[in-house]
Regions:
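Small-molecule kinase domains that catalyze NTP-dependent phosphoryl transfer to phosphate-bearing small molecules
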Residues: 67-68, 95, 128-177
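Conserved glycine(s) of the Walker
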Residues: 22
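Hydrophobic positions on the alpha1 helix immediately C-terminal to the Walker A/P-loop
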Residues: 26
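ATP-dependent small-molecule kinase phosphotransfer cores
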Residues: 39-100, 113-114, 125-133, 142
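Post-Walker A helix-loop "phosphate-sensing" segment adjacent to the P-loop in P-loop NTPases
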Residues: 32-39
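P-loop (Walker A) phosphate-binding loop of NTP-binding proteins
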Residues: 18
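Hydrophobic anchor at the beta1->P-loop junction of P-loop NTPases
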Residues: 15
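Extreme N-terminal, non-catalytic leader segments
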Residues: 1-10
Length: 195
């Protein structure tokens, strides 16, 4: 039996969104609220870059040419999703759950571009122009890669269970919405168990 604030074994939540939308902040809140471990797919990318002795820019350029890098990282995410019982943050995590028909509450977070850039500057420093240029280049690189490797358009949010806009909401408000969706998902899963 699960106590208050404890998620049942197997509850999986995927959180995706572009840089600056607040996904990491949301995941940290959900980790406490749902008592689930949290994994950031970007950390897997960083681990792989470090293991190869490359900085993120060089590793990103390499991944543009070598699809096996994304395949390995995706395999790790799919393995985690199959095990369940976690929060997985990554731009493709919801899509991977959908593609492999893995049970998960799939959440996409969006935010107006000006607000995203303001948050990125607050977090990482630099000028608005520097961050806008770097963010645009990163997003274009990822969008091209996802389209080329998987046929994925990140603008297609039709398969997500919940699409949130963080532009004018506090992280706690977003967390409330995800917790409610997770509870509804759990109730639905429990009522269909054994059918």
């Amino acid at each position: 039996m699960n106590g208050p604030g404890q998620a049942p074994r197997g509850l999986t939540v995927t959180i995706g969104g572009l840089p600056g939308t607040g996904t990491t902040t949301l995941c940290k809140l959900l980790q406490d609220r749902l008592s689930l471990p949290y994994t950031y797919a970007g950390a897997l990318f960083r681990e792989e870059a470090k293991a190869r002795g490359l900085d993120l820019a060089a590793f990103g350029a390499l991944s543009q040419k070598d699809p096996s890098i994304d395949e390995r990282l995706d395999d790790r995410q799919v393995h985690m999703l199959r095990k369940g019982g976690l929060i997985l943050e990554g731009r493709l995590s919801g899509w991977l759950a959908q593609r492999y028909k893995l049970p998960a509450v799939k959440v996409w977070v969006q935010c107006e571009e000006a607000e995203r850039l303001r948050r990125i500057v607050d977090r990482d420093g630099g000028t608005l122009k520097e961050q806008a240029d770097a963010t645009w280049a990163r997003e274009q690189s990822e969008a091209d890669r996802y389209r080329r490797y998987y046929g994925v358009d990140l603008r297609d949010t039709s398969f997500y269970d919940l699409v949130l806009d963080s532009t004018h909401k506090l992280p706690a408000q977003l967390a409330d919405e995800v917790v409610a969706a997770a509870q509804a998902w759990q109730h639905h899963a429990a009522s269909h168990k054994g059918r």
